[in-house]
């Protein structure tokens, strides 16, 4: 009886949204340029307007990251703070949009872009894969992102490591295709509790967001839960971040959506 109960609870915890896999198939086979088609060799920084232009020119989908500024605007930026990319100690959430858009990226003349400007640039030329960065359980970013994306006429997917963010979309914007990001989070140093990271790593938080797809780190696969979801529910699996020819080949052969970080040979294809 206990074993049966555990199996039932496990299935309840990991089960995704399965009714919209036909919609997800439109994204199968798409290669998304991780943070745009950026390259130090070409002087194109990550999550920059030039990286997004390059991806559009090569007809790649674009994966990008969103933070909410102190004054409630959305900017495209990956890290939790500005140290690595901009040489400043603050977090994106600590500054206004005006302050952030003055910050240059990795020593170039490129600046942190506003999400609205990226949407205007892409303008449905290629699909978008939008990751929400949600520190301190601030769901205001979900509302703001939805306000902008519902008036955008292009194809997009939304994803986050934060299952509460996916839950917000499930309840308030169920039409948006949403994905659970994950990896072997328990191996990483983090301020987030080990137990929460364990749950997200094993996709036990799927009961909150009921994701339409799973985006998992390729080098952390195979993973039992991911394998079970593929076999029994046909769940779409995206893999990240593919940086070599072998990884790209594996991603294309074994999984549905590929998120790559552009080797020079790919940029010049």
Where are these regions (language model features)?
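Phosphate-group recognition and catalysis centered on beta-loop-alpha active-site segments
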Residues: 1-269
